[in-house]
Amino acid sequence: MIDKTAIIHPTAEIADDAIIGPNVVIGENVKIGSRTRVIANAFVEFAEIGEDCTISPFATIGSEPQDLGYKGEPTKVVIGNGTIIKENATVHRGAACGDFTTRIGEKCLLMVGTHVAHNCVLGDQVIMANLATLGGHCHVGFGAWLGGMTVFHQNVRVGDMAIISGFSATRQDILPYSKGEGRPPVPSG
C-alpha cells in the first residue's frame, strides 16, 4: 500500500505488499522488498532495502555522502532483510571508492538518531543504540553492540560480538568478543 501523499520516483521498484506511509519520499534508484514498511516522513534514495524491514519517521536513507571528493558518482546503500531503522537515523550512500556502497546486514537495529557514514559495512544483527555514530569506512562485525552516544572515527573496525558502552569514543579497532568503555574504550568485564 502506498499512501496518496507519498512521492515516488518513477525508477523506484516497490514490492506489492510493502507499505509506504504518508509524506514519504522515495527517490530514484530505490528497491524496496516485500513486507517492508517505510513510515511517515522518511526519505529514501539510491538504496536497496530487503524484505521485512522497518524505516521509521524522519529516517534518511541514501543521501549523498559527507565526502568532499564525492562528485555525484552512482553509489548506493544496501540494507539486509529484517533490519529496523528508527526515527531520525541517517545512512549515507557510499562514496566513489571501494565498491561504492554502504552496507547494513540482516536483522540489525539502528536506534533513534544513529548515523552510518559512507562506505560503512555492518554485519548481521548489529545493534546501534541511540545517537551512536560511525565515521566513513567503518566495519562492524556480526552481533556487535554499540552503546548510546558512542563515536567511531573513520576506518575503525569493530569485531564480532564486541560490546562498547555508551558515551565511548575511539580511533582504534575493537577486538572481537570484547567489552570496552571510555575514550578510548578500555577492556572491562
Language-model segments: what does each one mean?
Residues I2-E181:
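Structural signal for interior beta-strand "rungs" in well-ordered beta-sheet cores
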